[in-house]
Curated annotation (Swiss-Prot):
Belongs to the somatotropin/prolactin family. It comes from Oryctolagus cuniculus (Rabbit). Its main location: secreted. Pfam families: Hormone_1 (PF00103). This is Somatotropin. CDD domains: somatotropin_like. Zn(2+) binds at residues 45, 198. Keywords: Disulfide bond, Hormone, Metal-binding, Phosphoprotein, Secreted, Signal, Zinc. It comes from the Eukaryota. GO terms for biological process: animal organ development; cellular response to insulin stimulus; growth hormone receptor signaling pathway; positive regulation of multicellular organism growth; positive regulation of receptor signaling pathway via JAK-STAT; response to food. GO terms for molecular function: growth factor activity; growth hormone receptor binding; hormone activity; metal ion binding.
Length: 216
């Protein structure tokens, strides 16, 4: 491995291992750039894990000839489509940082319940770690987003609890077609929602701290 890649890998690992700052009275404040770097790395990691699991599930359970039609049917399935959140980078750039943080928080919190059923629904080869680990990763990202919100609080009106309905739990019975399609749809939404959260965080980081990695 090239020295530059090895160094970059160590830096990314070190950032992922950093704790989020607690109350200001207990710990010194972390620079805003580090808060954003931590949040983006965690969101990227979760999004990649979700995408890999979706692909593994698809490969194991969904016949190739049926995937396209099923994916089209899933287009309006995600509850997150009911909130007025940006659908891509261009739309996200039109929103304030606080708006994007609040949307990101809503997306993350909507999955805190369902992911606790992951290990019961799938075999170990299909699940990225255990459900407890996924839950902990989501909670960690939630905490990081909340830390950013505290730093950037600007007195603007809150988005509010727009996502009234959370996602259902994953079905543990994989013998029926209905259960398979339900879990397939949930994994698709999980992947989409984490991609949105990652996009929002990267847009905010890039417009605050101009860097070469801002093209995505």
């Amino acid at each position: 491995m090239a020295a530059g890649s090895w160094t970059a890998g160590l830096l990314a690992f070190a950032l992922l291992c950093l704790p989020w700052p607690q109350e200001a009275s207990a710990f010194p404040a972390m620079p805003l750039s580090s808060l954003f770097a931590n949040a983006v790395l965690r969101a990227q990691h979760l999004h990649q894990l979700a995408a890999d699991t979706y692909k593994e599930f698809e490969r194991a359970y969904i016949p190739e000839g049926q995937r396209y039609s099923i994916q089209n049917a899933q287009a309006a399935f995600c509850f997150s489509e009911t909130i007025p959140a940006p659908t891509g980078k261009d739309e996200a750039q039109q929103r304030s940082d606080m708006e994007l943080l609040r949307f990101s928080l809503l997306l993350i919190q909507s999955w805190l319940g369902p992911v606790q059923f992951l290990s019961r629904a799938f075999t170990n080869t299909l699940v990225f770690g255990t459900s407890d680990r996924v839950y902990e990763k989501l909670k960690d990202l939630e905490e990081g987003i909340q830390a950013l919100m505290r730093e950037l609080e600007d007195g603007s009106p809150r988005v509010g609890q727009l996502l009234k309905q959370t996602y259902d739990k994953f079905d543990t019975n994989l013998r029926g077609d209905d259960a398979l399609l339900k879990n397939y749809g949930l994994l698709s939404c999980f992947k989409k929602d984490l991609h949105k959260a990652e996009t929002y965080l990267r847009v905010m980081k890039c417009r605050r701290f101009v860097e070469s990695s801002c093209v995505f």
